[in-house]
Amino acid sequence: MDGVNDSSLQGFVLMGISDHPQLEMIFFIAILFSYLLTLLGNSTIILLSRLEARLHTPMYFFLSNLSSLDLAFATSSVPQMLINLWGPGKTISYGGCITQLYVFLWLGATECILLVVMAFDRYVAVCRPLRYTAIMNPQLCWLLAVIACLGGLGNSVIQSTFTLQLPLCGHRRVEGFLCEVPAMIKLACGDTSLNQAVLNGVCTFFTAVPLSIIVISYCLIAQAVLKIRSAEGRRKAFNTCLSHLLVVFLFYGSASYGYLLPAKNSKQDQGKFISLFYSLVTPMVNPLIYTLRNMEVKGALRRLLGKGREVG
């Protein structure tokens, strides 16, 4: 950051989740348990998508990509959070903070784009079933995944670069438990209106455009589903789409609330828990949402466990 003094180069102090030290062990246990569930749930989906031949479809290719993103998304912030909750030190190095800023933005924006890609995949599956395999071929699937990754990287470079140009005010106390743009803007001296405008502009683009595409896709999907004569077919299509819509609502809702509110005006404790929601809670519940009513995943898991018992 321009104007950064020597002390700031030594690192930042993460203020954490709560101002009450007596609650830190409770938060540590709860967050550790949630993180372990995140690792288990998303790793299971990735393994099933790779090992089960019946799941070698575009839908599960993108779902395994989403699980990989969720694993990385949670891992970019939770281990540091656990370290700070466990010990007396609440610091993060300058390099660690900057790395976290870039990676968190990259993964978050990539997930925004990937959710749009998954909506497109569902649209083709429901509205163009006879051409689904031809349209969603492996080459296109990989291309869409790469576009999502590069789009997220572009967002990270733009927002992080603008944020790192801000001069610091002298103190190194980052409100919250991770280095992200709204928290870093609060550390700045002088006029931050340009940074806030860039933040709002980029976040609005990564929210309004994807959500518009998703809404249009699901309106078309709903029309197609209502034309299905089989009640079982309608139920299966609605269940698959409902899972994706719930994930979209959780991720976009919490991320938009955390990033589009003015950094200077948002409530401190509220902002911390919103950040916790999209950095840990959403990655934890995504596997549950996609698998609880998904018979294909349940069947694949039973077959995999059955093979494990036979080998044992």
Swiss-Prot record:
<dbReference type="GO" id="GO:0004984">
    <property type="term" value="F:olfactory receptor activity"/>
</dbReference>
<feature type="topological domain" description="Extracellular">
    <location>
        <begin position="260"/>
        <end position="272"/>
    </location>
</feature>
<feature type="transmembrane region" description="Helical; Name=7">
    <location>
        <begin position="273"/>
        <end position="292"/>
    </location>
</feature>
<keyword id="KW-0325">Glycoprotein</keyword>
<dbReference type="GO" id="GO:0004930">
    <property type="term" value="F:G protein-coupled receptor activity"/>
</dbReference>
<feature type="transmembrane region" description="Helical; Name=5">
    <location>
        <begin position="197"/>
        <end position="219"/>
    </location>
</feature>
<feature type="topological domain" description="Extracellular">
    <location>
        <begin position="159"/>
        <end position="196"/>
    </location>
</feature>
<keyword id="KW-0807">Transducer</keyword>
<feature type="topological domain" description="Cytoplasmic">
    <location>
        <begin position="50"/>
        <end position="57"/>
    </location>
</feature>
<dbReference type="GO" id="GO:0005549">
    <property type="term" value="F:odorant binding"/>
</dbReference>
<keyword id="KW-1015">Disulfide bond</keyword>
<protein>
    <recommendedName>
        <fullName>Olfactory receptor 2C1</fullName>
    </recommendedName>
</protein>
<dbReference type="GO" id="GO:0005886">
    <property type="term" value="C:plasma membrane"/>
</dbReference>
<dbReference type="Pfam" id="PF13853">
    <property type="entry name" value="7tm_4"/>
</dbReference>
<keyword id="KW-1003">Cell membrane</keyword>
<keyword id="KW-0552">Olfaction</keyword>
<keyword id="KW-0472">Membrane</keyword>
<comment type="function">
    <text>Olfactory receptor that is activated by the binding of organosulfur odorants with thioether groups such as (methylthio)methanetiol (MTMT). Also binds odorants acetophenone and benzaldehyde. The activity of this receptor is mediated by G proteins which activate adenylyl cyclase. May be involved in the molecular processes underlying fasciculation and targeting of olfactory axons.</text>
</comment>
<dbReference type="InterPro" id="IPR000725">
    <property type="entry name" value="Olfact_rcpt"/>
</dbReference>
<feature type="topological domain" description="Cytoplasmic">
    <location>
        <begin position="220"/>
        <end position="236"/>
    </location>
</feature>
<feature type="disulfide bond">
    <location>
        <begin position="97"/>
        <end position="189"/>
    </location>
</feature>
<keyword id="KW-1133">Transmembrane helix</keyword>
<comment type="similarity">
    <text>Belongs to the G-protein coupled receptor 1 family.</text>
</comment>
<feature type="topological domain" description="Extracellular">
    <location>
        <begin position="80"/>
        <end position="100"/>
    </location>
</feature>
<keyword id="KW-0675">Receptor</keyword>
<dbReference type="GO" id="GO:0050911">
    <property type="term" value="P:detection of chemical stimulus involved in sensory perception of smell"/>
</dbReference>
<feature type="topological domain" description="Cytoplasmic">
    <location>
        <begin position="293"/>
        <end position="312"/>
    </location>
</feature>
<feature type="topological domain" description="Extracellular">
    <location>
        <begin position="1"/>
        <end position="25"/>
    </location>
</feature>
<feature type="topological domain" description="Cytoplasmic">
    <location>
        <begin position="121"/>
        <end position="139"/>
    </location>
</feature>
<keyword id="KW-0297">G-protein coupled receptor</keyword>
<feature type="glycosylation site" description="N-linked (GlcNAc...) asparagine">
    <location>
        <position position="5"/>
    </location>
</feature>
<dbReference type="InterPro" id="IPR017452">
    <property type="entry name" value="GPCR_Rhodpsn_7TM"/>
</dbReference>
<feature type="transmembrane region" description="Helical; Name=1">
    <location>
        <begin position="26"/>
        <end position="49"/>
    </location>
</feature>
<dbReference type="InterPro" id="IPR000276">
    <property type="entry name" value="GPCR_Rhodpsn"/>
</dbReference>
<feature type="transmembrane region" description="Helical; Name=2">
    <location>
        <begin position="58"/>
        <end position="79"/>
    </location>
</feature>
<keyword id="KW-0716">Sensory transduction</keyword>
<feature type="transmembrane region" description="Helical; Name=4">
    <location>
        <begin position="140"/>
        <end position="158"/>
    </location>
</feature>
<feature type="transmembrane region" description="Helical; Name=6">
    <location>
        <begin position="237"/>
        <end position="259"/>
    </location>
</feature>
<keyword id="KW-0812">Transmembrane</keyword>
<dbReference type="GO" id="GO:0005938">
    <property type="term" value="C:cell cortex"/>
</dbReference>
<feature type="transmembrane region" description="Helical; Name=3">
    <location>
        <begin position="101"/>
        <end position="120"/>
    </location>
</feature>
